[in-house]
């Protein structure tokens, strides 16, 4: 399954064994640890096991990881995740991570747009949300706002960064019904 829109510079596809190095690079990028709960590097062995056992059924495991592929080069450039999926409430949390040299070039926006289309079409999801650091993630805040997400709440002192706690902004988008 590759999901794309013909004019999009990216496509989304399932995780493959060949994605080991991409996963290794992103999961071990300590600059990303500040915006998630990971604080430990992963070995290639552990990631290889993860890839081999990664279920691709959102209904079964309530999460789905897709690889972002740059259409022009066919190279994997990032990861987009759906987590905390609630079929009853038709919602899921999203997160995205791109290779450093691909950030700020519009790939994030295009990937999230594709994810919106995919989740709405195949899973009936009507609402997506993201938790974003309010302290210093202007690029992510700007990206979600440009895609029509609203900052609906601030979770004070929600996330520990170093010795401090920072606020997290909750961005939400109610997806319009497709005809």
Can you describe what each PLM-predicted range is?
Residues 31-53:
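Conserved GNAT-fold acetyl-CoA-binding loop/helix
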Residues 53-56, 158-160:
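Short, P/G- and charge-enriched loop/turn segments at secondary-structure junctions
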Residues 24, 55-58, 120:
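N-terminal cationic-hydrophobic initiation segments that often serve targeting/anchoring roles
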Residues 10-11, 16-36:
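Short amphipathic alpha-helix that is part of the acyltransferase structural core
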Residues 1-19, 65, 69-179:
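Acyl-donor (CoA/ACP) binding surface of acyl/acetyltransferases
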């Amino acid at each position: 399954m590759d999901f794309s829109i013909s004019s999009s510079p990216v496509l989304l596809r399932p995780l493959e064994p060949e994605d080991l190095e991409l996963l290794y690079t992103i999961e071990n990028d300590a600059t990303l640890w500040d915006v998630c709960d990971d604080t430990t590097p992963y070995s290639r062995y552990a990631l290889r096991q993860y890839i081999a056992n990664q279920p691709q059924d959102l209904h079964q495991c309530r999460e789905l990881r897709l690889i972002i592929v740059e259409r022009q080069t066919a190279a994997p450039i990032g990861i987009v995740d759906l987590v905390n999926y609630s079929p009853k409430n038709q919602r899921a949390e999203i997160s995205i991570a791109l290779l450093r040299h691909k950030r700020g070039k519009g790939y994030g926006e295009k990937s999230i747009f594709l994810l919106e289309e995919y989740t709405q079409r195949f899973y009936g999801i009507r609402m997506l949300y993201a938790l974003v650091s309010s302290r210093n993630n202007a690029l992510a805040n700007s990206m979600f706002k440009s895609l029509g997400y609203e900052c609906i709440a601030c979770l004070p002192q929600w996330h520990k960064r170093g010795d401090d706690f920072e606020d997290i902004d909750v961005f939400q988008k109610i997806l319009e019904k497709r005809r």
